[in-house]
Amino acid sequence: MARRRSTRRALVETPSDLNAQDSDSLSVSTKEELGDDALAAEEGQSVLDEQEIEEALEEDDTNYEEDIIDDEESAQVDEEELEEEEEEEEDATPEPVVTSKKNSRSKPKNGGASKRKASRRTVVDEDSENLEGDEEDGSFSDLKDLYSNPMPAQTTPVSMRMTKRQRAIQGILEEGEEDELLELPPETSGRKKLTPEEMALRRIENARRRKNQSERRLEEEKMETINRLLKRQSNTGKPRRGRAPNNPTSDSISRSKAVPKDRINMYQPFQCVRFKSTKEGSSLGVPEPLIRFFS
């Protein structure tokens, strides 16, 4: 329909342009000379041109309708051939189907090659769009399945994430890999596990040690009490300070007969030098013990 309207516009516009050129070419003097006859001739010519345009448009419409009918018939034939081919070959891809459509169509008739080529292109474009839509639907469905199904927690094997020593301990060796690692003792740290006999011997030893410690503690306490009692007895034999003993001995008698010594006064004044300066004169006072230092 769009092509039909464009052809009509082109055909309608061409005579008006011709008339405009003719009218421009005619000078004013010739129009005055010809007068009414020239105007009537121009009007008749324009009417004839319009009739020719309408006839050409009608012919184009009839040709276009014939082309459409031919295209529909060829499309039906192509559909039948495609159905037969699909029944014969179930594993055929969509691409050869499109090529068969192009090749199976009959040659155009009545000179409508360009329009039929355009219709073929539209059919092929529709098929390609349908195929692209199917592919997009398939990709969307694949994405939905991918997101709906949970991913496994461990995509890589466990042996790939272990060290060489860990694999050797568990006995997992790769191709061409030799077990050259030294195996450490299983219990390098921690307490040693004892047998029941060793446990019984250890308990007996601990009981013996506790018994010896208690006996030693008792002996020490006994010795402390004995020393304390002996110390008290030795203190009771001594006279108290300031009192004479009840039984005078030879030592006490000799002490009483001894001459008493003079008691030394422990108080000593502060030793200092005194300097005195008056109108009569100055003087220096020095204590007796310090005179030898100033002589």
UniProtKB/Swiss-Prot annotation:
The answer on whether this UniProt entry bears the keyword Signal reads no
Comp. bias intervals (Basic and acidic residues): 194-225
UniProt keywords (A-Z) are: Chromatin regulator, DNA damage, DNA repair, DNA-binding, Nucleus, Phosphoprotein, Transcription, Transcription regulation
Q: Which GO terms describe its molecular function?
A: DNA binding
Task: According to the UniProt record, list the residues that bear Phosphoserine.
Answer: 128
Q: Give start-end positions of Polar residues composition bias.
A: 16-29, 246-255
Q: Give the matching InterPro entries.
A: INO80B/Ies2 (IPR029523), INO80B_C (IPR006880)
Q: Which domain of life is it from?
A: Eukaryota
- Which locations, inside or outside the cell, does it occupy? Nucleus
Q: Write out the GO biological process terms.
A: CENP-A containing chromatin assembly; DNA repair; DNA repair-dependent chromatin remodeling; transcription initiation-coupled chromatin remodeling
Bias category Acidic residues: which stretches?
Answer: 49-93, 125-139
SMART domains the record matches: PAPA-1
The annotated regions of Basic residues compositional bias extend over: 102-120
What task does this protein carry out? Component of the INO80 complex which remodels chromatin by shifting nucleosomes and is involved in DNA repair.
Protein name, entry field: INO80 complex subunit 2
Q: Look up and give the organism this protein is from.
A: Schizosaccharomyces pombe (strain 972 / ATCC 24843) (Fission yeast)
